[in-house]
């Protein structure tokens, strides 16, 4: 319903982005080799975040923390390091959570991704120029934000609903970063893998 109380049908073209990785970054220095200033940077940042999740282990949480800090453009506090640890250790999630967002991974195959590693993401379904959540929309008028914040989505077998993060483009560097702490929105519990994990 528009602002005149009339019902409208809005056609929206949803773009998808698939990233295929021949090499997988395992630390922040390797992560920095990827260009996140390009037009698709907001999606690439999300793809790199998912790859960062794969590096967390109980014996080496540091690489994952540093990778997320880089993509978030700020150092991770101890509170969020503890949050990350708790989410990764719950149900041994660190063994499959990062893989769950990759193409080919399903609960039935214990979240084993297809090779080569690839991730498919999609843009927001909200209409409007650029899909910024701070722009005027016929049926939704959010608070204006600076910088403009954009949502990037993933649909995957681990959940019956989409997951997303918010990103923004840095005004000086042109790099796309994760907005605030939305990086942890992908850490919500997912469907359990079929077997071979101890709980």
Model regions and ranges:
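Surface-exposed, charged secondary-structure patches
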Residues: 80-158
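Short beta-strand edge/turn micro-motifs at domain boundaries
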Residues: 7, 155-198
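Intrinsic-disorder/low-complexity loop/linker signature
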Residues: 4-7, 16, 145, 174
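Flexible glycine-rich surface loops and low-complexity tracts that mediate binding to linear polymers
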Residues: 1
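Core segments of small alpha/beta cavity-forming domains
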Residues: 6-106
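Contiguous hydrophobic segments
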Residues: 57, 73-74, 113-131, 181-199
């Amino acid at each position: 319903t528009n602002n005149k109380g009339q019902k409208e049908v809005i056609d929206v073209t949803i773009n998808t982005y698939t990233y295929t990785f021949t090499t997988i970054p395992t630390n922040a220095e390797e992560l920095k080799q990827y260009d996140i200033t390009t037009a698709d940077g907001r999606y690439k940042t999300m793809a790199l975040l998912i790859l960062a999740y794969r590096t967390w282990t109980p014996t080496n949480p540091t690489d994952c923390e540093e990778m997320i800090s880089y993509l978030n453009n700020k150092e991770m506090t101890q509170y969020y390091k503890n949050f990350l640890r708790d989410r990764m250790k719950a149900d041994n999630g660190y063994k499959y959570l990062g893989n769950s967002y990759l193409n080919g991974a399903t609960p039935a195959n214990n979240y084993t991704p297809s090779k080569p590693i690839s991730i498919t993401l999609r843009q927001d379904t909200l209409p409007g120029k650029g899909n910024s959540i701070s722009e005027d929309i016929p049926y939704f008028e959010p608070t204006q934000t600076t910088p403009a914040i954009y949502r990037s989505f993933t649909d995957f077998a681990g959940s019956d609903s989409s997951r997303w993060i918010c990103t923004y483009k840095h005004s000086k560097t042109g790099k796309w970063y994760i907005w605030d702490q939305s990086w942890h929105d992908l850490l919500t519990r997912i469907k359990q893998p079929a077997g071979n994990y101890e709980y």
